[in-house]
Swiss-Prot record:
NF-kappa-B is a pleiotropic transcription factor present in almost all cell types and is the endpoint of a series of signal transduction events that are initiated by a vast array of stimuli related to many biological processes such as inflammation, immunity, differentiation, cell growth, tumorigenesis and apoptosis. NF-kappa-B is a homo- or heterodimeric complex formed by the Rel-like domain-containing proteins RELA/p65, RELB, NFKB1/p105, NFKB1/p50, REL and NFKB2/p52 and the heterodimeric p65-p50 complex appears to be most abundant one. It comes from Homo sapiens. Induction: By phorbol ester and TNF. This is Nuclear factor NF-kappa-B p105 subunit. GO terms for molecular function: actinin binding; chromatin binding; DNA-binding transcription activator activity, RNA polymerase II-specific; DNA-binding transcription factor activity; DNA-binding transcription factor activity, RNA polymerase II-specific; DNA-binding transcription repressor activity, RNA polymerase II-specific; identical protein binding; protein sequestering activity. Pfam families: Ank, Ank_2, Death, RHD_dimer, RHD_DNA_bind. The modification Phosphoserine is found at residues 337, 449, 759, 892, 903, 907, 923, 927, 932, 937. The gene is NFKB1.
Length: 968
């Protein structure tokens, strides 16, 4: 610390002293406290530095200090204290200790030294005549109150001048002649008193009360015995008040997460020892193999620091977001003022999970082959394809599709199904056929079985013996199969169950055969699906039904067919079935952006109110991903209104997610649908306007204020308004916007402006009443401070410069008239309202509609705001309006031949490049409000008729009166 002090190393910067006096006043080399000094004469050296941190400065009302200022090497069981030594000298001496500042230039400090040998804030100790080491075991530091700094400092300077204690160094260079002690009751003249007063006034403004240094000065006796021979003073390392927020040791106490995604932006709660909210950073760093260091900083504002002990921040993006394995880094607190850091803690960046909904994973599963439908395996009997995908002969085992399971039944092979007759003692068979049953002709038919069982209509097995019951016959009707079983013993009941399966299998085989015939005739795949519609409720290993999988694989026509064949009794169960991630088919349709499938599912009765595993409804998912087309379809449903203000598992409404995704179209849809723009998210009470300010998105903030009538002074749970956040983050544009919308810069939040424990100077003056923090208190720059005090916002460029960029005047009036007519057509894709959105003036559409000629008003406003023909052509190109483009090209072709400077490059790349020059790289200029910051204030766009720029708003319940002026 001391060796880096600019004062100790650059004497020419101290008070601009006369070079002839520099050597006599002091030599900077003697200020190296731990270094042997290159001189043959006496000099002063620091043997033990004071401990820099952990010692508390005490106020008068707190009483004396408990223990003296410890030394740097002091330990619990081995105390040490600051020590100095007078080298190259043996004899009597006097050493004085003064408190000085820690700034670039050393001055007297207003705090006082107290303890043994201390008087008037100065410690005086005698040394020698043999032991020239002087220790200071009982030094305390008395903290002066802010109100008494000037008074104390002036008295301290006067005393230093009277006694000759370094007045030229510590007070003013013009007082350097008052050096030697022995002046006694030296009287100071008016000029000297005025110099002292001016120095005290100046230093009072600059003094840091949380840090001091010790300045040791030794005096040796002269020939008369008076201590007038001054040795060069030495200055200790800085001593920080342990009660000062910017002086305490930085320490991370707890974090709720120690890992995050490489993309950053994940919220972490960090508990720490006391910090100063405007003087702290959260630093992530990694030491690279080549010796370099990567670092990133957590994103938070002063409003995210709670009572100096907790910080809520968002993680920074890692240097490489394409890593395939986790990367270990460190996180630490760092103070801005002195770059002091805490002990680092490990943090893990893991690769980005791009498929959180597992849609891509399921799409990448092995697709079934056509040959798989014929079954496989081996067996002793005849093979063949089967309805259940099994094959082989008798005794062979079949293969079902992956993820599905069907029971293996032991029956003889029939129609491709493997049956095994040896599972029971009976060799019961089955009769089938038409009215002329073949079983009567077959001597080996099933009616010749010895043991018989009868199955009644209720599925119960009735046991009889051959003596009790006559052999039964199998009767077969047209299209029916009736089984009659011979009775047997109780042990043969398993065979009856096998026979039941055989009966059902035969019925199923006939149904599938008929469906196949119908499909061959009609070519309609629904004929095949209809006989299997009950199987649509089957789920695979991920819980997905066939409807889920059809949506995942983007088979929209198959989804329609499935919805049609399952309509009826079981449709509700299937259409709202959830997989293992609690996703319904409607959730997946929204995630995969299939607008037509969303419409089909809603028509079929899909339930909008069902939530996924994270509590997200389909409105949340659409807003989160910025799918405005899907969101528009969902909002038309009658149940959508009930979900507009429903929070998800993170306490966020759909409008909050639209803000976080920076989607202006989604925000406009939600506002138009009636979403509550003042709704608070449930974690900290932020509204959509708070989130817009946090994301520094002036377009969304302007939309909320102008279109949504958002409450400009809405508060979070701790009383923070959007203006608090804008001021704390230093955003001049948003501060100007909010101030123009009527935000109050004097609103206090619940965060105390200062800590009572650190403000003993207020004792006795309304003790316990601490004001909150206002946006003015949080202003991080003078520009923001001036805006909050009513000074007009001044952009970095001038209006004249922007006017020079506009070239709309080159279009003749007849050309403009043709454009007006083309833009007045009712086609919503080609009218003036769509063009306004493309030109970044969509926020003013409601105002344009008030004009008798909206298209003319739009073009006039665009021209006055510095618009260019290039931007206009590009906007029309995006609309696909070739007729309007041809009108402009035809009018501009003569100009092109005469002046290359006014040519119209119609290349999209070049046009976009010109547009981007007027836009910030980190935001989208499409709300109109943002355009007003980059171009001329649009108050000049209309000079007659209804004003388009003073947007009259509905009366507010929260006290905002009058119109919201467009000029900021």
């Amino acid at each position: 610390m001391a060796e880096d002090d600019p004062y100790l190393g650059r004497p020419e910067q101290m008070f601009h002293l006369d070079p002839s006096l520099t050597h006599t006043i002091f030599n900077p080399e003697v200020f190296q406290p731990q270094m042997a000094l290159p001189t043959d004469g006496p000099y002063l050296q620091i043997l033990e530095q004071p401990k820099q941190r952990g010692f508390r400065f005490r106020y008068v009302c707190e009483g004396p200090s408990h223990g003296g200022l410890p030394g740097a090497s002091s330990e619990k069981n081995k105390k040490s204290y600051p020590q100095v030594k007078i080298c190259n000298y043996v004899g009597p001496a006097k050493v004085i200790v003064q408190l000085v500042t820690n700034g670039k230039n050393i001055h007297l400090h207003a705090h006082s030294l107290v303890g043994k040998h201390c008087e008037d804030g100065i410690c005086t100790v005698t040394a020698g005549p043999k032991d020239m080491v002087v220790g200071f075991a009982n030094l305390g530091i008395l903290h002066v109150t802010k109100k008494k700094v000037f008074e104390t400092l002036e008295a301290r300077m006067t005393e230093a001048c009277i006694r000759g204690y370094n007045p030229g160094l510590l007070v003013h260079p013009d007082l350097a002649y008052l050096q030697a002690e022995g002046g006694g009751d030296r009287q100071l003249g008016d000029r000297e008193k005025e110099l002292i007063r001016q120095a005290a006034l100046q230093q009072t403004k600059e003094m840091d009360l949380s840090v001091v240094r010790l300045m040791f000065t030794a005096f040796l006796p002269d020939s008369t015995g008076s201590f007038t021979r001054r040795l060069e003073p030495v200055v200790s390392d800085a001593i920080y008040d342990s009660k000062a927020p910017n002086a305490s040791n930085l320490k991370i106490v707890r974090m709720d997460r120690t890992a995050g995604c490489v993309t950053g932006g994940e919220e972490i709660y960090l508990l720490c020892d006391k910090v100063q909210k405007d003087d702290i950073q959260i630093r992530f760093y990694e030491e690279e193999e080549n010796g370099g260091v990567w670092e990133g900083f957590g994103d938070f504002s002063p409003t995210d620091v709670h009572r100096q002990f907790a910080i809520v921040f968002k993680t920074p993006k890692y240097k490489d977001i394409n890593i395939t394995k986790p990367a270990s880094v460190f996180v630490q607190l760092r103070r801005k003022s002195d770059l002091e850091t805490s002990e680092p803690k490990p943090f893990l960046y893991y690769p980005e999970i791009k498929d959180k909904e597992e849609v891509q994973r399921k799409r990448q599963k092995l697709m079934p082959n056509f040959s798989d439908s014929f079954g496989g395996g081996s067996g002793a009997g005849a093979g063949g394809g089967g309805m259940f995908g099994s094959g082989g002969g008798g005794g062979g085992t079949g293969s079902t599709g992956p993820g599905y399971s069907f029971p293996h039944y032991g029956f003889p092979t029939y129609g491709g199904i493997t049956f095994h007759p040896g599972t029971t003692k009976s060799n019961a068979g089955m009769k089938h056929g038409t009215m002329d049953t073949e079983s009567k002709k077959d001597p080996e038919g099933c009616d010749k079985s010895d043991d018989k069982n009868t199955v009644n209509l209720f599925g119960k097995v009735i046991e009889t013996t051959e003596q009790d019951q006559e052999p039964s016959e199998a009767t077969v009707g047209n299209g029916e199969v009736t089984l009659t079983y011979a009775t047997g013993t109780k042990e043969e009941s398993a065979g009856v169950q096998d026979n039941l399966f055989l009966e059902k299998a035969m019925q199923l085989a006939k149904r599938h055969a008929n469906a196949l015939f119908d499909y061959a005739v009609t070519g309609d795949v629904k004929m095949l699906l209809a006989v299997q519609r009950h199987l649509t409720a089957v789920q695979d290993e991920n819980g997905d039904s066939v409807l889920h999988l059809a949506i995942i694989h983007l088979h929209s026509q198959l989804v329609r067919d499935l919805l049609e064949v399952t309509s009826g009794l079981i449709s509700d169960d299937i259409i709202n079935m959830r997989n293992d991630l609690y996703q319904t088919p409607l959730h997946l349709a929204v995630i995969t952006k299939q607008e037509d499938v969303v419409e089909d599912l809603l028509r079929a009765g899909a339930d909008l109110s069902l939530l996924d595993r994270l509590g997200n409804s389909v409105l949340h998912l659409a807003a989160k991903e910025g799918h405005d087309k899907v969101l528009s379809i969902l909002l038309k449903h009658k149940k959508a209104a009930l979900l507009l203000d429903h929070p998800n598992g993170d306490g966020l409404n759909a409008i909050h997610l639209a803000m976080m995704s920076n989607s202006l179209p989604c925000l406009l849809l939600l506002v138009a649908a009636g979403a509550d723009v003042n709704a608070q998210e449930q974690k900290s009470g932020r509204t959509a306007l708070h989130l817009a300010v946090e994301h520094d998105n002036i377009s969304l903030a302007g939309c909320l204020l102008l279109e949504g009538d958002a409450h400009v002074d809405s508060t979070t749970y701790d009383g923070t308004t959007p203006l608090h956040i804008a001021a704390g983050r230093g955003s001049t544009r948003l501060a100007a916007l909010l101030k123009a919308a009527g935000a109050d810069p004097l609103v206090e939040n619940f965060e105390p402006l200062y800590d009572l424990d650190d403000s003993w100077e207020n004792a006795g003056e309304d003790e316990g009443v601490v004001p909150g923090t206002t946006p003015l208190d949080m202003a991080t720059s003078w520009q923001v401070f001036d805006i909050l005090n009513g000074k007009p916002y001044e952009p970095e460029f001038t209006s004249d410069d922007l006017l020079a960029q506009g070239d709309m005047k080159q279009l003749a009036e007849d050309v403009k008239l043709q454009l007006y007519k083309l833009l007045e057509i009712p086609d919503p894709d080609k009218n003036w309202a769509t063009l306004a959105q493309k030109l970044g003036l969509g926020i003013l559409n409601n105002a344009f509609r008030l004009s008798p000629a909206p298209s003319k008003t739009l073009m006039d406003n665009y021209e006055v705001s510095g618009g260019t023909v290039r931007e206009l052509v590009e906007a029309l190109r995006q609309m696909g309006y070739t007729e309007a483009i041809e009108v402009i090209q035809a009018a501009s072709s003569p100009v092109k031949t005469t002046s290359q400077a006014h040519s119209l490059p119609l290349s999209p790349a070049s046009t976009r490049q010109q547009i981007d020059e007027l836009r910030d790289s980190d935001s989208v200029c499409d709300s109109g409000v943002e355009t007003s910051f980059r171009k001329l204030s649009f108050t000049e766009s209309l000079t007659s008729g209804a004003s388009l720029l003073t947007l009259n708003k509905m009366p507010h319940d929260y006290g905002q009166e009058g119109p919201l002026e467009g000029k900021i």
